Regions:
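Terminal amphipathic alpha-helical/low-complexity segments used for targeting or macromolecular assembly
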Residues: 1-92
Length: 92
């Protein structure tokens, strides 16, 4: 399954900073994400490591300062990421 960042941002009511047409193919934990995955950084621990991440996109808190990564700002990154996980892996 594939989805664009703009579609993800609409799903989670987030704000994209970066390439809104980027296509995401999956979800992964922060330290395991590849260039085709989206992940989230909801704590200071992970926000400090954002520049080292290989993720294609990262969901961050709305007050996070802009980075050179493709990000989606959300009110609650953990909840937003859970919504994206449910999109990729719907419960039957």
């Amino acid at each position: 399954m594939k989805i664009s960042l703009v579609s993800i941002s609409e799903l989670i009511e987030g704000e994209i900073i970066g390439d809104e047409n980027k296509v995401i193919c999956g979800v992964a934990p922060f330290e395991e994400a590849t260039s085709q995955d989206i992940t989230y950084a909801g704590s200071t621990k992970y926000l400090k490591k954002i520049y080292d991440s290989n993720a294609g996109a990262i969901i961050v808190p709305r007050d996070f300062q802009t980075s050179d990564k493709d990000i989606i700002k959300a009110d609650n990154p953990r909840v937003a990421f859970a919504q994206v996980v449910n999109f990729f892996h719907p419960k039957s």
